[in-house]
Amino acid sequence: MEATGTWALLLALALLLLLTLALSGTRARGHLPPGPTPLPLLGNLLQLRPGALYSGLMRLSKKYGPVFTIYLGPWRPVVVLVGQEAVREALGGQAEEFSGRGTVAMLEGTFDGHGVFFSNGERWRQLRKFTMLALRDLGMGKREGEELIQAEARCLVETFQGTEGRPFDPSLLLAQATSNVVCSLLFGLRFSYEDKEFQAVVRAAGGTLLGVSSQGGQTYEMFSWFLRPLPGPHKQLLHHVSTLAAFTVRQVQQHQGNLDASGPARDLVDAFLLKMAQEEQNPGTEFTNKNMLMTVIYLLFAGTMTVSTTVGYTLLLLMKYPHVQKWVREELNRELGAGQAPSLGDRTRLPYTDAVLHEAQRLLALVPMGIPRTLMRTTRFRGYTLPQGTEVFPLLGSILHDPNIFKHPEEFNPDRFLDADGRFRKHEAFLPFSLGKRVCLGEGLAKAELFLFFTTILQAFSLESPCPPDTLSLKPTVSGLFNIPPAFQLQVRPTDLHSTTQTR
């Protein structure tokens, strides 16, 4: 009986191997860009070690050039774009063809092509247009949205003051502050930083960010077909996403119970519910409960973690480089003084501060591999034929860290974004939010939050580290879909903005 079972297992493995070889042979590799030869079952696992996927792709680009093909597992070919020229040519020059959303295997089972982020085609166009207009009506990009961020920044400063100079990890508070801005837009609610449920939701958002970026997440990207039913890190990620989903469902149910069908939308959930009521008799409508939930869950996750991670990394940089912190505070003192709260209109008066924020985003490269794209139709690109549905990784980190564009890219140097007269200058290679039709939905909100949270904190405090600045590490502890900076302890001390300033 045991022998029969052994032979059955061997036969199954042999058939799987033959199937892998057959499928690999029908992938029309001759029409895709060149790349390392994939192994049966393993794909390019030998060249792409989980936990170091981005660095592995950059290493392969030195051999295969700026456009090449890799296999994540046996059946998932991905075309990789490296450098500004290739990424711009694809995402900008052939924007429609490269406008599809690719796969994030760890989240695929949850979102399943629904919501504004993971949908494609007509569903995506309708949801994106509706979401952008609704958020704009709610104040995003307007004075109301700015006042919302300013109020939350003041709450954050008051909470920082409560630490009374003691070292603390600011990551949770920063995430709660940015999440409150998003929750105000999504649900019309602001939560206390002491609210246990709110803390759990914010931690779940952080756990999701870590889960999709970790070594386990990268392994799952390659072998989800095999790992999905097994225990592993992906099960923990599902728990985090379930926490976000349960919280969102509760908020939606409360809105359904007190929705004013004749009144204006109070928030994005209201706007969705009103639109769903309008489309109730349309059997082909994309304004469904699932699309609403998946849109809101993603915005809650992304809006919580992306901005807070970047603000935290910028604070870490200013502790490591006290002279940069000093120059930022002097500029704030010179231009705003002690009594004027920072506003978005002050950005042009604060060129050095703006340069620091841009350089921090460049150095962090929060999404080094870009969010995966997929081809919406069969496309000719650089002499290759990319079939419809081909996945694409546009490596944004390869642009932000390109030594041919940014000299000594591993160094923190805000002067890259200043001209000879000290005025802020834009850089066409600054693409942390990607480009093309899938450019980040919340780019405007994120920029406003970064500027207002950062300047409000620096106007109120000097930042100190409990350990010597030169011992602080800037290297991401996790690098996958997202770069996650190291945790750190922060000490804040009220600053005297009436002190004498000096010219840089």
Curated annotation (Swiss-Prot):
InterPro entries the record matches: Cyt_P450, Cyt_P450_CS, Cyt_P450_E_grp-I, Cyt_P450_E_grp-I_CYP2A-like, Cyt_P450_sf, Cytochrome_P450_fam2
GO molecular function ontology, one term from the record: hydro-lyase activity
Keywords: Endoplasmic reticulum, Fatty acid metabolism, Heme, Iron, Isomerase, Lipid metabolism, Lyase, Membrane, Metal-binding, Microsome, Monooxygenase, Oxidoreductase
PROSITE patterns (UniProt xref): CYTOCHROME_P450
Cellular component GO terms held in the UniProt record: cytoplasm; endoplasmic reticulum; endoplasmic reticulum membrane; intracellular membrane-bounded organelle
Recorded metabolic or biological pathway in which this protein acts: Lipid metabolism; fatty acid metabolism
Cofactor(s) required for function per UniProt: heme
Subcellular location: Endoplasmic reticulum membrane; Microsome membrane
Binding annotation for heme: 440
Gene Ontology BP terms: cytochrome metabolic process; epoxygenase P450 pathway; icosanoid metabolic process; prostaglandin metabolic process; retinoic acid metabolic process; xenobiotic metabolic process
Tissue expression pattern: Expressed at higher levels in extrahepatic tissues including trachea, lung, stomach, small intestine, colon, kidney, breast, placenta and spleen. Expressed in peripheral blood leukocytes. Constitutively expressed in skin (at protein level).
Family: Belongs to the cytochrome P450 family.
Function: A cytochrome P450 monooxygenase involved in the metabolism of retinoids and eicosanoids. In epidermis, may contribute to the oxidative metabolism of all-trans-retinoic acid. For this activity, uses molecular oxygen inserting one oxygen atom into a substrate, and reducing the second into a water molecule, with two electrons provided by NADPH via cytochrome P450 reductase (NADPH--hemoprotein reductase). Additionally, displays peroxidase and isomerase activities toward various oxygenated eicosanoids such as prostaglandin H2 (PGH2) and hydroperoxyeicosatetraenoates (HPETEs).
Name the record gives this protein: Cytochrome P450 2S1
Annotated source species: Homo sapiens (Human)
